[in-house]
Swiss-Prot record:
This is UDP-N-acetylglucosamine 1-carboxyvinyltransferase 1. Its EC number is 2.5.1.7. It is an enzyme of class 2 (transferase). InterPro entries: Enolpyruvate_Tfrase_dom, Enolpyruvate_Tfrase_sf, MurA_subfamily, RNA3'P_cycl/enolpyr_Trfase_a/b, UDP_GlcNAc_COvinyl_MurA. GO terms for molecular function: UDP-N-acetylglucosamine 1-carboxyvinyltransferase activity. The gene is murA1. The active site is at C116.
């Protein structure tokens, strides 16, 4: 069993660089299947989700070279082979293979996607879009088959009943080579959607409106290879900014796009966090007294659900009472009892997280229950007096590139051990 051990209470200082966006790259890699030549992705994070996607792609027949933060993907040999089991089941983002395989072959048979347990996250919106474009859906045991019965996908007008990043991206991928025009209304607006659309447009697709709530895709016959720089990970950036405010003695977070973090930064300003925003970095000063705030998550450009948990340890340092309401994923509260185990005055009440501070945390054995809860526990461990042991760390390694090395470079006493 692997665990992360932190001896907390150290003041951190220095500079940390943000890696490429996890939530982009997990869609960009499957999207390369649509190309008829090599696609090169730069800025790819060193995370286990990428490792799993590379394994899946190679099983399908892709030839992939990986050097540093660059992936060179030759999708020409990809075959439409059924993949009902294996890594495809443990990876939430595996659903993007439905869009790419439908777009290339008109069919796909894959195991149902996994990932973090954050409450209901059905793929109904994805299936509704695929059906509108002419695909049929059937179930074979624990896998699902989509097929167009030998016909190409057809452009369609698609209204998303709820705002969904995954369904918006999957529809864009599937529609890129469909016959005719596809219009997505009530589309999600996240930066990662723009990133995927940029890759596809550079491959020869005709996509307009990414980043707005109406996206139009004019299908094309073929897509070619290209080179693409993955955008910085706004969630990783927010995580390190929150950590810097909680325990830092002057930390510069680089490779940051401020415009992707405006709602998050606004809440830090409300708390009284002192920081300097530069062109592609944010310098976070050592903090004094912070004020408790209340937060409600919402789709972009609102406060990101993925930043709710990493921000929580910083909130615990603030004076006063506050609350967190996650309107996106109702079960994103599993970090609360773990923080309480460390001495935090925090609980759940009527579906809302409530807290009171300031708190002095103490090291304790805790368990990461999902990716962002794991990030919260790492920050809490850095803040706490004494030794913190975090188990179930595979969740953390899914989404934070070289996290041990990055924190060590700032002065943290943190290590990954195997027992």
């Amino acid at each position: 069993m692997r665990k992360i051990i932190i001896n907390g209470g150290k003041q951190l200082t220095g500079e940390v660089a943000v890696s490429g966006a996890k939530n982009s790259v997990v869609a960009l890699i499957p999207a390369t299947i649509l190309a008829d030549d090599v696609v090169v992705l730069d800025g790819v994070p060193a995370i286990s989700d990428v490792d799993s996607l590379v394994d899946i792609m190679e099983t399908m027949g892709a030839k992939i070279k990986r050097y540093g933060e660059t992936l060179e993907i030759d999708p020409c040999g990809v075959k439409d082979i059924p993949m009902p089991y294996g890594k495809i089941n443990s990876l939430r983002a595996s659903y993007y293979f439905y869009g790419s395989l439908l777009g290339r072959y008109g069919q796909a048979t894959l195991g149902l996607p996994g990932g973090c347990d954050l409450g209901p996250r059905p793929i109904d919106l994805h299936l509704k879009a695929f059906e509108a474009m002419g695909a049929s859906v059937s179930y074979e045991g624990d896998s699902m088959r989509l097929a167009t019965n030998g016909k190409p996908l057809q452009g369609a007008n698609i209204y998303m009943d709820t705002v969904s990043v995954g369904a918006t991206i999957n529809t864009i991928i599937a529609a890129a080579k469909a016959n005719g025009r596809t219009v997505i209304e009530n589309a999600a607006r996240e930066p990662e959607i723009i990133d995927v659309a940029t890759l596809l447009n550079n491959m020869g697709a005709h996509i307009r409106g990414a980043g707005t709530d109406v996206i139009t895709i004019e299908g094309v016959k073929s897509l070619h290879g290209t080179r693409h720089q993955v955008i910085p990970d706004r969630i990783e950036a927010g995580t390190y900014i929150a950590m810097a405010a909680a325990i830092g003695r002057g930390i510069k977070v680089t490779n940051v796009l401020y415009e992707h973090l405006e709602s998050f930064i606004a809440k830090l300003d409300e708390m009284g966090v002192r920081m300097t925003v530069e062109e592609d970095s944010i310098f976070v000063e050592e903090q004094e007294r912070l004020k408790a705030v209340s937060i409600k998550t919402s789709p972009y450009p609102g406060f990101a659900t993925d930043l709710q948990q990493p921000l929580t340890p910083l909130l615990l340092t603030a004076e006063g009472n506050g609350s967190l309401l996650d309107t996106i994923y109702e079960k994103r509260v599993n970090h609360v009892p773990e923080l309480a185990r460390m001495g935090a005055n925090i609980s759940t009440l009527g579906g809302k997280i409530v807290y009171s501070g300031p708190n002095q945390l103490s090291g304790a054995p805790v368990k990461a229950t999902d990716l962002r809860a794991g990030a919260a526990l790492v920050i809490a461990g850095l803040m706490a007096e004494g030794r913190t042991e975090i188990t179930n760390i595979e969740f953390i390694l899914r989404g934070y590139s070289n996290i041990i090395e990055k924190l060590t470079s700032l002065g943290a006493d943190i290590q990954l051990v195997e027992e």
